[in-house]
Amino acid sequence: MKKEVIVGSRDSALALWQTNWVVERLSKIHPEINFKIVTMKTKGDKILDVALAKIGDKGLFTKELEHALLNKTIDMAVHSMKDLPTVLPEGLKIGAFCEREYPGDVFISPKGFKFLELPQGARIGTSSLRRIAQILAVRPDLQAIPLRGNLPTRFRKMEEMDLDGIILAYAGVKRLGYEDKITEMLSFDLCLPAVGQGSIGVEIRADDTFIEELLKPIDHFATNRAIRAERAFLKRLEGGCQIPIGAYSEVKENRLHLKGVVASLDGKLVIKGEKEGSIEEPEKVGISLAEELLTKGAQKILEEIRRDANE
């Protein structure tokens, strides 16, 4: 009889696509194992009428899966890397960083507008503070309209609310087959992605060497190094979804290149920077860029946002 490995997943269409993607690869590599998917709803799936920044809870899309891991009811949990907090619960770790899809954002306009050609005061659907701050930095006249839910829900709301456009992660749009709706790919100069965007991560128990070995073939070297740098950058800034922070790292010619941004909520102050370093020291690259941005003015932005959040 085949050994069974239980894989935990959120129950959204995108989460299941990603979990099936992981399981298909693992099943080919380990045909002697039966991988069984178990789904569950997270707090972030249940609260859809409030912006994530207002809920203000880390691990909104991961906690239930992490509890199942720690309770040993599942053997691994598949996440969007951008949902995984930089500090994991004690006893858990990331077992694999799967090869990254293009991590950028896309602009979708039912009216066919290119982003920079939007009319004055155009209404753009997004609840992401990172996206709002970066688009306001370029177009302060735009109105950001809160928009949450799965992709079909967002497309429906876009039409119902007569929005001029919405901003989404390319990876999710592609994975669910909505590429034909894309009006424009947003450049990194305009909008740096969320930390980990475009990559699927597999979380495991830190002491489970059997599962760790199973995952090694799907841990993608360049993605592993890039996202570790981004996560170290975010962790040093102590940023969650309440703070507009973007980052993108890639391996080029055996060196790690990292771009980062911290912005005020209104987009009036934007602190950007870049860092290059050794692929063997991704955390060092991330921390170094974070500290550089803190001295360039990011510290002031972070303090103001945290003070306002506590009032």
Swiss-Prot record:
Its EC number is 2.5.1.61. It catalyses: 4 porphobilinogen + H2O = hydroxymethylbilane + 4 NH4(+). InterPro entries: HemC (IPR000860), Porphobilin_deaminase_cofac_BS (IPR022419), Porphobilin_deaminase_N (IPR022417), Porphobilinogen_deaminase_C (IPR022418), Porphobilinogen_deaminase_C_sf (IPR036803). Its cofactor is dipyrromethane. The keyword Cell membrane does not apply. GO terms for molecular function: hydroxymethylbilane synthase activity. The keyword Transferase applies. It holds the Pfam family Porphobil_deam. GO terms for cellular component: cytoplasm. The modification S-(dipyrrolylmethanemethyl)cysteine is found at C241. Keywords: Porphyrin biosynthesis, Transferase. CDD domains: PBP2_EcHMBS_like. Tetrapolymerization of the monopyrrole PBG into the hydroxymethylbilane pre-uroporphyrinogen in several discrete steps. Belongs to the HMBS family. The porphobilinogen subunits are added to the dipyrromethane group. This is Porphobilinogen deaminase. It comes from Carboxydothermus hydrogenoformans (strain ATCC BAA-161 / DSM 6008 / Z-2901).
